[in-house]
Amino acid sequence: MTYELEFSEKAWKEWMKLGAVVKEQFKKKLAERLLNPHIPSARLKGLGNAYKIKLQSAGYRLVYRVSNEVLIVTVIAIGKRAGGDVYEAAT
């Protein structure tokens, strides 16, 4: 069962600002998550059905929300880890 991918408007703007290398790294991870989006270790506490993808080498985080009713993974925030701003943007 494969989920579809969507971006919130704000997340799409952030996606378009990313460099090619970071985008490719996120694309690979997102492709895996569309097959299995519910990764217990990536779940974010206090944000409902939200999960994160970490790019440790680049310092970026991507936050997505899973909707099981319609099989959609929605990217809601992308940004640097510093200061936790990406997690605040996801709320």
Briefly describe each language-model feature range.
Residues 2-6, 10-13, 17, 24, ...:
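Enriched for short, Lys/Arg-rich terminal
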Residues 1, 46-50, 73:
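Short, charged low-complexity linear motifs
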Residues 31-55:
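A short, surface-exposed loop/turn module that caps and links secondary-structure elements
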Residues 21-34:
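Compact soluble domain cores
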